[in-house]
Amino acid sequence: MIFSKAISTIFHPIFAPFVSVLLTCCVVQKTIIVDSCKIPNILISVFIVTIVVPLLATLYMLKKKYVASFEMKEKKERVYALRVNSLLIGLGYLFTNKIYFCQYNKDLSTLLKLEFLAVIFSVYIASEISKHYKISLHLIGFGGVCAVIMRLTSLAGDLLWLLCIFILLSGVVASARRYAGAHTRKQIYFGFFLGFVIQFLFFYL
């Protein structure tokens, strides 16, 4: 049980958007002419918007007892927290897009915008689904990251090795969530499928 909780914490879905952007920036630096000195600014802003702000919001909700724990086991807690965070990430996107994304290479800017919009949409859809059905947020995150890696193959060529690593990690996290009794298989599969499809489809909009 301790191991499964550790895995769930280390691979918390809050980190998924940042990981996607980090992978994108690493690949883009090698394939597109872009000022590498500006990459840290992007990563710092995304880290703040997708990790620091939602974390602070969750801590505030814990303090005000809108949620009982970080696990958010109750349906109402998950819906409320997801809606708040989708709004905060959306506002963060508007700020980041205006200050950073629009200043950079068009190809990189487009990729980052689509990833952000897909994340916002995924979180919002997850909040709506959570009204009626519990879904694995961890696997939504992993599904999204895997979709980003597949998308990046059009720029960097064969990234099969990286995709295999994240699919393997998805399996580890899924097993940990199952062992902890947090989700059924259907909830896990549905989460991965939803995260993957939303992120993948946004690229082709």
Regions found by a protein language model. Give the residues of each.
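Core segments of transmembrane alpha-helices
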Residues: 84-97, 141-146, 194-195
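Membrane-water interface of transmembrane alpha-helices
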Residues: 52-65
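Juxtamembrane helix-capping/reentrant segments at transmembrane boundaries
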Residues: 69-85
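Alpha-helical transmembrane segments
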Residues: 38-53, 118
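Membrane-interface helix termini and inter-helical loops of multi-pass transporters
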Residues: 29-38, 67-71, 99-108
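Short, Lys/Arg-rich, polar N-terminal cytosolic tail immediately upstream
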Residues: 1-4
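Membrane-embedded catalytic cores of phosphoryl/pyrophosphoryl-handling enzymes
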Residues: 106, 112-205
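The first (N-terminal) embedded transmembrane alpha-helix
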Residues: 8-28
